[in-house]
UniProtKB/Swiss-Prot annotation:
This is Zinc finger CCCH domain-containing protein 46. Residues 106-129, 230-248 have a biased composition (Polar residues). It comes from Oryza sativa subsp. japonica (Rice). A zinc finger (C3H1-type) spans 2-29. SMART domains: ZnF_C3H1. The gene is LIC. Transcriptional activator that binds double-stranded DNA and the single-stranded RNA polymers poly(rA), poly(rU) and poly(rG), but not poly(rC). Mediates optimal plant architecture through brassinosteroid (BR) signaling. May act as a negative regulator in sterol homeostasis. Acts as a negative regulator of BR signaling. Binds to the specific DNA sequence 5'-CTCGC-3' of BZR1 promoter and negatively regulates BZR1. Acts as an antagonistic transcription factor of BZR1 to attenuate the BR signaling pathway and regulate leaf bending. Interacts with GSK1 and GSK4. Pfam families: zf-CCCH (PF00642). SUPFAM superfamilies: CCCH zinc finger (SSF90229).
Amino acid sequence: MSRRQEICRNFQRGSCKYGAQCRYLHASPHQQQQQQQAKPNPFGFGTGSRQQQQPSFGSQFQQQQQQQQKPNPFGFGVQGANAQSRNAPGPAKPFQNKWVRDPSAPTKQTEAVQPPQAQAAHTSCEDPQSCRQQISEDFKNEAPIWKLTCYAHLRNGPCNIKGDISFEELRAKAYEEGKQGHSLQSIVEGERNLQNAKLMEFTNLLNSARPSQTPSFPTMSSFPEVKNNSSFGASQTNGPPVFSSFSQIGAATNIGPGPGTTAPGMPASSPFGHPSSAPLAAPTFGSSQMKFGVSSVFGNQGSGQPFGSFQAPRFPSSKSPASSVQHRDIDRQSQELLNGMVTPPSVMFEESVGNNKNENQDDSIWLKEKWAIGEIPLDEPPQRHVSHVF
């Protein structure tokens, strides 16, 4: 027995480092026994062993069928008869793809038999009953998975339920609250309260449905920070007033309570002296309702004047003590500024006298380019020689 026919002990242990170049056989004892049985007679004495090893034609066909029925080990479906039985009935023809992903899925024939469901376009709502019916159908057939959203039961109509919050915004809010030190339980509880409040809004809308034909405009009530119920109505809170019209700005700008304060929408005096005949209030500028320490912005106007004959405003001549003091301060400051910019005459006279005094002195010392030791003068140079020195 040669060394090549001996089984490698290191291979049986799984630690042979020679691989295919090993002098010993890399095979299990069972494989070696099968190879010895299948090996023909090397000396050629008789053909019995060869005849036994040659399979018949029937056995070859059975083996081929078994190989075809065996599933693909790579997971790309099945082969042979299994593929035909799973797909559409009948033999597969070229250029005909009849493969169905889900056998229970409806085919085109069944879809053609079933009539399409007519989806009514909700464009009008005449009475509360029809509105409630439309809303209930929407909640039944088109209920949103994400509840924190808006809803309008009319196409191109106003939003009946406002306040859309996406899950990204909710996640960002949770992270922000986590950084601020809030516990996870409180964050989850707040999100649950938001969802319950939104579900309650849907329920209330279904119970109290009202017809609505008005177009959808962005309102201030869409934002949760504003407490006002309407964007164009009067304010119901203590915050900044929301005016119903531009004519109410003058009435709302009254500082402090007083007899001249009027309610929004009430007629007030006209800026031209006669009362307004329109039901709206007077404009802001020129109305007698603004109180800043004077009776009116433009003074008292004569009544009954037409629009074209508007006279010049007569300003009140009386001045308050505070305003007069302020004007005096301004005049004094402006005078000081002007005095600083213009040289006083006294300074100019002193400079001229100094120049005349220096004219009698010897100027040769100031005209030298280099001074010797002891010749440096202690006095200031005359003004006329400053440019020559520097």
